[in-house]
């Protein structure tokens, strides 16, 4: 199968306000979004953290829609840049690249395989890992990326992996250091997505 049959990629300019990106296609299956900031337009550092324009950032997503294949209504999603607690919440415009890809297991024309999964994180505590199995095993340990797909919790959040194998992996979320140091603090349940792929994809 050709990659373009179940996925598309692009770029856009976004900031710390929500932006809606409309895709070029509609999809029969639910889609996952993977996005990264590919520019660095932060301002001058300051010793006053609240005024510091140089800050860590994370992409937040919401309202991911696969579109409607019957009406040819394309898919879409909302995206913004988020800064951690204690920094100014306003971030300047940055270039972001994204991949929209349909859920499922896909065999490409070159023989490589990839799998896209969408699931809810069941643990709400910081740094508490949960196991996630692939739908079918890979022949070797695959490459793996994942991203939070919702913004049910408004605190800054990022994901960590460990014990990646041919059959699955473990994943945990981390909030910023202010929230994360409170080991008992909980984050609302979010929808997560992963993309696992053969070496050489």
Regions found by a protein language model. Give the residues of each.
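Extracellular receptor-binding modules and their adjoining Ser/Thr/Gly/Asp/Asn-rich linkers
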Residues: 1-201
């Amino acid at each position: 199968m050709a990659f373009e049959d179940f996925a598309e990629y692009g770029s856009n300019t976004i900031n710390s306000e929500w932006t809606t990106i409309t895709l070029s296609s509609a999809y029969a299956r639910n889609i996952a979004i993977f996005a990264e900031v590919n520019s660095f337009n932060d301002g001058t550092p300051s010793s006053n953290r609240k005024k510091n324009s140089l800050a860590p950032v994370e992409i937040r997503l919401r309202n991911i829609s696969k579109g409607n294949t019957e009406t040819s209504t394309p898919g879409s999603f909302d995206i913004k840049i988020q800064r951690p607690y204690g920094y100014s919440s306003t971030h300047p415009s940055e270039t972001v690249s994204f991949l929209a890809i349909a859920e499922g297991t896909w065999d490409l024309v070159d023989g490589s395989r990839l799998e896209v999964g969408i699931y809810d994180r069941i643990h709400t505590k910081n740094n508490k890992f949960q196991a996630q199995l692939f739908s079918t095993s890979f022949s070797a340990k695959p490459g793996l990326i994942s991203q939070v797909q919702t913004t049910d919790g408004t605190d800054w959040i990022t994901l960590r992996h460990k014990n990646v194998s041919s059959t699955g992996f473990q994943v945990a979320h981390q909030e910023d250091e202010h929230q994360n140091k409170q080991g008992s603090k909980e984050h609302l349940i979010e929808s997560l997505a992963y993309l696992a792929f053969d070496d050489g994809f």
